[in-house]
Structures are given as structure tokens and as C-alpha cells.
């Protein structure tokens, strides 16, 4: 039971973190629509993370149905904000490289503090 409660707190904390980081700290020239897309993308990426799916462009495209360009545009802004980190890994066929992403340690540090506060 405590595990489910903890997951709910963490999920809520992620939503609050995403809204604050993205809406309260706009990037120059960024549209409101772009910020809303980033918040939605954060939620999708977090669900993928919880399901132990690799955060690759191909996986995100498969799940969202977005175009490759749309996914890249949104994810690159999250990388620029320091929310995601990017590494190059092998693609699923093992022949080329694939861009892989993961949440930066600052995200989980922020969530850890929020869930600890929420559980008190």
C-alpha cells in the first residue's frame, strides 16, 4: 500500500515539477504551445521510464504518433532545459546509432524532496 501511495506522490510531484520548470522558466522565442507540448511529453516520458522502456526517438514516435521532427523539437527543448540528458546508443538493429534520453539527476532529486515533503 505504501508503494502505491509513494508512486502517486511521485507522479503528482512530476506534474508540479514539469509545470514549474517549463511554464515559470520560458526559453526566449518559445511559444505557449511549445511549453504545453513539453509538459505533455514529460508525462509520456515518465510513464515510459516507469515501464522500463528506453527513451528513444523511435519509441516516443511509436507511442505518441507524432512526427520525428515534432518529437525532436520537443525533446531538444527538454534537453536544453536540463530536464533530460542525451546519449548515443546502438539502434535496435545494432548497426547505427540511436539518440537515447534519460531524466537528469536533478529531476529525481526534485521529486525525492517533493515526495518526502508530501509523505510527511
Please place each PLM-identified region on the residue numbering.
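General nucleic-acid-binding
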Residues: 1-12
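Short alpha-helical segments that sit at the start of domains
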Residues: 11-43
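Short, cationic-aromatic polyanion-contact patches
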Residues: 34-35, 56, 89-114
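Short helix-capping/hinge SLiMs at alpha-helix to coil transitions
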Residues: 47-52
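A short alpha-helical element within helix-turn-helix/winged-helix DNA-binding domains
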Residues: 53-65
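Short amphipathic alpha-helical interaction segments
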Residues: 65-80
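A short, conserved structural fragment
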Residues: 79-91
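Helix-turn-helix/homeodomain-like alpha-helical modules used for DNA recognition
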Residues: 114-120
